[in-house]
Amino acid sequence: MHTKSKRYDILLWDIDGTLMDFKKAEAMSLSQCLREIHIEPEQDMIEDYSRINLSYWKRLEKGELTKPEVLLGRFTEFLGKYDIKTDVKEFLQHYEEGLGHFNFIQDDSLKLCQCLKEHGFRQYIVTNGTVDVQRMKLRETGLGRIVDGVFISDELGIPKPQKAFFEICFEEIFGEKEPDQNQRSRVLIIGDSLSSDIQGGINAGIDTCWYRNPGEDNTESMPITYEITHLHQILDILYS
């Protein structure tokens, strides 16, 4: 661990696609659900679902859909595309249960977070994921015992990247919804989603760190404070 003075001391972590490998968990859970109804999953089916799922979450971020519309709508579209006859709500329930159990740690993130905790960093989870799934992940991986707090959009009543989401976070962290710039300068958000995490950081007036997954590009030329391709690169930023 570096020994220079810290530039930031409050970290806001995204879970899915950042601390944990969401695509792998998504593929495993979807495959399990399909096999339960006697359908052998193929790679193109999994990739189709992933694209459909992402499009629905982006519409949630823009305020075009509600969370229930996202959760059911993505499967209604996916199952309809492949003419799969099954109960959509039951399929969703089994899928969500799988997501909570299939936990794949990314870049040794738990050890990283534990190390940062031991060096005095305050760490918080900021996620749009469903409450039951995220709480299960936090419990089963032990991440919930490491971080200082958890902000789940369903519990807050508003999703990332909305400014109001972060105002609620700030109220718990700083005791006020609109902290001054000196306070905001202590905070760094780290996440893989440009539209949710990075835009959220911009809306909140805090610095951002984009965890760029392979093959992804900043096609919208969104202003980003930092960019990393491995989570442990965050140490160079925190102690620069």
Positions of PLM-derived features:
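N-terminal helical cap/lid subdomain that shapes the substrate entry/recognition surface
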Residues: K4-D107
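Generic recognition of short, well-ordered alpha-helical segments
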Residues: K24-M28, D107-K111, M136, K163-A164
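Short glycine/serine/threonine/alanine-rich loop segments
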Residues: I39, F121, I206
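Short glycine/serine/threonine-biased micro-segments
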Residues: E61, T127, I189
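Helix C-cap/helix->beta junction micro-motif
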Residues: Y82, H119-G120, A204
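Substrate-recognition element of Asp-dependent hydrolases with the DxDx(T/V) motif
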Residues: E90-L92, G98-F104, S109-T141, G149-S153
